[in-house]
Amino acid sequence: MLTTTIPQFPDTKLYISLFRNVSNAPEIVDSLAELPYSIIDARTLLSREQLLSAVYRAMLEKHCNKLRTRNLHTEVLLCLSPTSNVMSQIGDAMKRFGIKKDSTSVVLVKAVTGDETFDPKGFSEVIRGEELEFSDTALRESADIDTIRENYKLKCFECERLEELSAALVHAIQLRGL
């Protein structure tokens, strides 16, 4: 599990975990509305930087009172999306980046602000699977490059290294809506 803060938001602590061999994805999908986390299909993530970029953008939207979703955790999924089409954008982001019934690797994100308490063991109470270190190496083992390229409309983008693709993903996230 990664526990971190973003320098611009020192009062918000982030807990991020990667799980593989998840055996209860259908149950999680059915109870998503009650869970206070962002739950992302790890096939759609290539790097820590990609996810942290979306988290930063979601926190910025919250700080400016511009959330387009009901909470920060859903906003993270929306911020992963490179598209700025407001129509059906939230549903599309959930379909593209959220946990699916066939997901076997997932990333959970919990943002804790102020006096709110959180027990990190809560992740393993929700997910039946093996918790891994949240690292670029572990994410790349789960990443589906074709799905990522399709989600970000980068099918023709040529790159020699995955770091270049990761940078393109971060740019797409940060430039969306400008």
From Swiss-Prot:
One of its GO terms (molecular function) is tRNA binding. Keywords: Activator, Chromosome, Nucleus, Telomere, Transcription, Transcription regulation, tRNA processing. One of its GO terms (cellular component) is nucleus. It is found in: Nucleus; Chromosome, Telomere. The keyword DNA damage does not apply. One of its GO terms (biological process) is telomere maintenance via recombination. Coiled coil: none annotated. Pfam families: CGI-121. SUPFAM superfamilies: PF0523-like. InterPro entries: CGI121/TPRKB, CGI121/TPRKB_sf. Belongs to the CGI121/TPRKB family. Component of the EKC/KEOPS complex that is required for the formation of a threonylcarbamoyl group on adenosine at position 37 (t(6)A37) in tRNAs that read codons beginning with adenine. The complex is probably involved in the transfer of the threonylcarbamoyl moiety of threonylcarbamoyl-AMP (TC-AMP) to the N6 group of A37. CGI121 acts as an allosteric effector that regulates the t(6)A activity of the complex. The EKC/KEOPS complex also promotes both telomere uncapping and telomere elongation. The complex is required for efficient recruitment of transcriptional coactivators. Component of the EKC/KEOPS complex composed of at least BUD32, CGI121, GON7, KAE1 and PCC1; the whole complex dimerizes. This is EKC/KEOPS complex subunit CGI121.
